[in-house]
Design a protein with these regions (language model features):
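Conserved donor-binding/catalytic core segment of Leloir-type glycosyltransferases
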Residues: 438-462, 468-473, 479
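Aromatic "clamp/platform" in nucleotide-sugar-dependent glycosyltransferases that forms part
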Residues: 517
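Short hydrophobic beta-strand element within catalytic cores of glycosyltransferases
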Residues: 534-537
Length: 571
């Protein structure tokens, strides 16, 4: 039996007149609070983000679920998550100086639609009603609880008007907020830092600082339980004649796909997992905002201008990725709680707080940046004279943001064996799309000396230096595809020859070799395997053990030489 509906029958229904009186009182109290704050030189100020106390000890932590146990209207929870997401952007990472006052509303600002807030549940005059900014009390409850545990001074705090079963109000650990006259205000004689985060299921709050060791520690005292009071839910109370009654929301939660990199493996995953209500951007779905004609023209001009001003190519590329991330964020709606995202946009979305409260899978197109740079650093130690190995070095903050976002992801989708090994239980293995085999009739006949195809630009990170060292004393021909090249390559007795395309390289080769330090899309190796050619490659190429190929470790010249000799490929 619905206890909420039963309670509703024993209480008088709220009237429009009462709602008008409440609104007038609220605006009067808001004006009074504004006047008092204007006259108070010690009123709360907005506090900036900082990292001074990022490594300080945690004084208090709080953890609470985001989804109620018996939820009848998930759209209102989605609205609450959107409201928490917006508030976290103003709260996470702030640091408050000793003696400075913290005010919840001064820091967060008013919750309005224009500022990105949505309709969630709000407890007002005994009823749970849909309201803009509803659900922020879960954050104020957490902040009050953590503040008391951390030894902060509570300057202002208000209890909820009703006690919901199972809530912190039963233990007198709650703090309601209502713009702007019901506030939560804190201060402390020591500097303190606030960290707030949420994943798809839980809200977590942490307060850091260096409190005086002689100060009294505040474990939260166990207060007598306040009795729960009946509260009506406007979505399910069944009082249809009430002017507040809305009924359950008609919207449904859904998944959003953003296929920035149209790998065939990702397209196959979309075809297999696309739901009826899913929104898809990219191949098979809607056009990306950046594909609008005016955006294409603007991007081209921005690219040329950046290069003309001398900006490095990676910087220009990062600027474009930031723009794409803003496009994605602009398309997100509150019911989009399940996302499939490209790895390239992940750090920007994480930094902007758009992934908080959402479950997401990542389409992995490369190794994580921190791992990629470790691989390149290993190559630099072997070839310190090669400048191209130092090209890719991302900003430390960007690397950290990507790694944190990857750790919070539900799954990593990839066909790359190395990426899947790193993902562990998070990994979702996709099968490499095997290309059509080159026709045997077009293959060149064996020549007097072996022909090895190197299926990548002859750069140090692709292993060209190791290959040349392995065959230096052998009479072999190395076929190179079009593309950039290291300068001053010395093949020894071997010879280098350019071919017109990757296809021509496969048609003329006796074997394919790629001892790469880094390789994210081994399409040419897959083509060689499909054609039945012997393949020697490193695990960095991401080929699965189920395919026929010979592994060698990156940088292992002697191992490469043995593998080539075993396969009669010129080693």
């Amino acid at each position: 039996m619905n206890t909420v509906a039963t309670a509703a029958t024993t209480t008088d229904l709220p009237t429009r007149r009462e709602a008008l009186v409440f609104a007038c009182k609220a605006w009067g109290l808001r004006a009074l609070r504004a006047l008092r704050d204007a006259a108070d030189p010690g009123r709360p100020r907005r506090h900036p983000r900082a990292n001074t106390l990022a490594q300080a000890p945690a004084l208090a932590e709080f953890d609470s679920p985001l989804w109620p146990g018996e939820e009848v209207d998930p759209m209102l929870v989605a609205g609450k998550l959107q409201n928490l997401r917006q508030a976290l952007k103003r709260l996470d990472g702030i640091e408050v100086a000793p003696g400075a006052r913290f005010g919840f509303w001064k820091q967060v600002g008013r919750a309005t639609r224009r500022r990105g807030y949505a309709i969630g549940r709000e407890l007002r005059e005994g009823c749970l009603i849909p309201a803009i900014g509803g659900g922020l009390c879960q954050l104020s409850n957490a902040l009050y609880d953590g503040a008391v545990r951390a030894g902060l001074t509570v300057l202002e705090r208000h209890r909820h008007s009703r006690v919901l079963p199972g809530s912190l109000a039963e233990q007198d650990r709650d703090a309601t907020v209502f713009w702007n006259y019901l506030d939560l205000r804190l201060c402390a004689p020591f500097a303190w830092r606030l960290e707030v985060e949420m994943d798809a299921q839980r809200l977590r709050l942490r307060i850091r600082g260096h409190r005086d060791v002689d100060a009294v520690s505040w474990p939260m005292a166990v207060s007598p339980r306040r009795p729960a009071t009946p509260s009506n839910d406007c979505g399910s109370c069944g009082q249809y004649e009430c002017h507040r009654h809305t009924g359950p929301s008609t919207g449904r939660l859904r998944r959003l796909w953003w296929l920035q990199e149209a790998w065939p493996e990702f397209s196959a995953a979309l075809a297999a997992g696309r739901g009826e209500d899913d929104r898809v951007f990219g191949p098979g779905g809607r056009r990306f905002p950046a594909q609008a004609p005016w955006r294409r023209a603007a991007q081209s001009l921005s690219w040329r201008y950046g290069r003309w001003r001398g900006r490095a190519l990676p910087q220009v590329r990062l600027a474009q990725l930031r723009a794409h991330a803003r496009d994605l964020a602009g398309q997100l709606q509150l019911q989009d709680l399940d996302l499939v995202l490209p790895q390239s946009l992940l750090p920007f979305l994480w930094r902007d707080g758009e992934l908080a409260g959402r479950r997401y899978a990542v389409l992995m197109t490369a190794l994580p940046m921190r791992v990629l740079q470790d691989e390149l650093d290993a190559a630099v130690r072997r070839h310190p004279q090669v400048r191209s190995l130092r090209d890719f070095r991302a900003d430390e903050t960007l690397i950290a943001d990507e790694w944190q976002a990857l750790q919070a992801a539900e799954t990593w989708w990839s066909p790359h064996a190395r990426v899947l090994a790193m993902a562990g239980e998070r990994g979702r293995a996709l099968s490499w799309a095997m290309p059509a085999a080159v026709p045997a009739s077009g293959r060149a006949s064996a020549g007097a000396r072996p022909r090895l195809f190197f299926p990548a630009s002859p750069l140090a990170r692709k292993g060209i230096l190791e290959l040349l060292e392995a065959v230096r004393d052998r009479d072999v021909e190395i076929l190179l595809p079009p593309g950039d090249s290291e300068r001053g390559l010395d093949p020894g007795r071997a010879t280098l020859r350019r071919v017109d395309s990757y296809r021509h390289g496969l048609l003329q080769a006796d074997g394919v070799v790629l001892p790469a330090w880094v390789e994210h899309q081994p399409r040419a190796l897959l083509g060689a395997i499909a054609a039945g050619l012997p393949v020697v490659a490193t695990p960095a190429c991401g080929l699965p053990a189920s395919l026929p190929w010979t592994p060698v470790e990156a940088g292992d010249v002697e191992g490469l030489r043995r593998a080539l000799r075993t396969l009669s490929m010129g080693g």
